[in-house]
Every structure is written in structure tokens, then in C-alpha cells.
Amino acid sequence: MIPYGRQDISEADIQAVLDVLNSDFLTQGPQVPLFEKTVANYCNAEYGVAVNSATSALHIACLALGLESGDWLWTSTNSFVASANCGLYCGANIDFVDIDSKTYNLSVVELENKLIKAKLENKIPKIVVPVHFAGQSC
């Protein structure tokens, strides 16, 4: 098997999961607001919101950025469907930017070319969702 990624799970991580499993709450218990506060502090943000999936997180991000019907969202052709669906959930138009053949990430050259064309057509995207393939940042 070709290893795609490796996890770094400590004994403390395992114990934290066991503590929740042995508690009265699997969801919406006291660990959730503690987690949200810890993440917010780490990110130097006022708030943090725990959600059930990256799909939900992307949807909330689109809502927070005011994405709506008639707007455009662009994302990578090499991604899970959530990268596009988050825009569809807001009624936006979806389009894709091709990938770089070496990194498999969204191509900066293709993005630039597409932005130039979109400006001429008055179809500049409100949001671009880059996808960091296999841990590589765009």
C-alpha cells in the first residue's frame, strides 16, 4: 500500500476520546465549548464554532462571507465535492480552476488567466476555495 498520510495520535488524544466516551455526553457536552474556546484562543479569534464536517464548515464560511445567488465561487478541479457544494448551498454559481500538473493544487497561472477573463465578463468570483492537496499549500 502506498501511504497517503500518517496520523499523529498521542496517548493524551486517546485519553481525551475515552473521557468523552465514558461521560454522559457524546455530542453537545461540556467538551464542545471548551474545544471551541481553545481553538478560538489559538487562532486569536473572538469565537470558534465546532461543526460536524468540513462541508458544514465551508458552508458556514460562505454564509459568513455573504455568498448568495448570482455570486460566483471557484474551486479546484481536484477536490472533494464539498468545495463546490458549499457555494451551491448558498445559491451561487460554481466554476473550476484547473490544477498544476506537478503539485495537483489549484494552478496559480490558470487562476490568474481565469481572473483576467472573468473581469472582462464581469464575473469575478466572490470566493475562491483553494484545496491544499496532500498537505501541500497552494
What label would you give each PLM region?
Residues M1-F25, P30:
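N-terminal "arm"/small-domain region of PLP-dependent enzymes with the aminotransferase-like
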Residues P3-G5, V51-N52, V129-V131:
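Short beta-strand segments
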Residues I9, T27, S79, K102-T103, ...:
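Glycine-/small-residue-rich active-site loops that bind phosphorylated ligands and cofactors
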Residues F25-W72, C86-L88, F96-D98:
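Phosphate-binding glycine-rich loop
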Residues A61-N113, K117:
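Conserved PLP-anchoring active-site segment centered on the Schiff-base-forming lysine
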Residues K102-C138:
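Active-site phosphate-binding strand-loop segment of PLP-dependent enzymes
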